[in-house]
Design a protein with these regions (language model features):
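Intrinsic low-complexity, intrinsically disordered or marginally ordered coil/linker segments
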Residues: 1-188
Length: 188
């Protein structure tokens, strides 16, 4: 899939609803025909298996079966989909199973980084910067400023705008470095 969005989900709800969803996803993870195409359309197959119509719901993509797990009463898994997080699919699953799905999605080709986890309970990161540290994800502006400062040599960084300017100045002299700096959008 070109322009793939990678999305992580944390699903909350009553245990029996979560286990029912997980079991169905486990069952559908093994293609009945053994075809790669069937596996790559697992979002579509989940909609069909629960009585929905895939032609009415944007559901192009698949979940990664090896990421499907329960941890501390939360169902966790990852999805690859075309272009963006499959919000119609998510809304359908939330309604069908009476659950709440929190997500973090990124599509770096278009610099789309989003979460609907406003409180940061499951996805606390609010900034993305792949310039220097081991992880490109940062929860606070202070963490981001420190990391940007280490790379650029700039001091007294305290806002995202300061960081953006410092990275821009740095890239002016280091054109060959593929550095991305972005705020993660919080949607509701």
């Amino acid at each position: 899939m070109a322009n793939i969005a990678y999305t992580e989900y944390a699903v909350e709800g009553q245990t029996d609803n979560l286990l029912r969803l997980k079991q169905l996803m486990d069952d559908l993870a093994v293609p009945s025909t053994g075809s790669d195409e069937e596996l790559s359309n697992s979002l579509d197959r989940l909609v069909t298996a629960t009585g929905g119509n895939p032609s009415e719901i944007e559901c192009r993509g698949f979940w990664k079966p090896f990421t499907l797990r329960m941890e501390n009463g939360i169902l966790l898994f990852e999805v690859e989909s075309k272009w963006v997080e499959p919000s119609q699919w998510r809304a359908f699953i939330e309604k069908t199973f009476n659950v709440r799905m929190f997500y973090y999605t990124e599509q770096l080709g278009e610099l789309i980084l989003k979460t609907n986890d406003a409180k940061g309970c499951h996805f606390p990161y609010r900034y993305y910067f792949n310039g220097s540290s081991d992880s490109p994800y940062f929860e606070t502006i202070d963490e981001l400023c420190e990391d940007v400062g280490e790379l650029t040599g700039e001091e007294d960084l305290s806002t995202f705008e300061d960081c953006s300017k410092a990275v821009s100045n740095y890239l002016h002299n280091h054109l060959d470095e593929p550095i991305i700096l972005s705020q993660i959008t919080v949607t509701i």
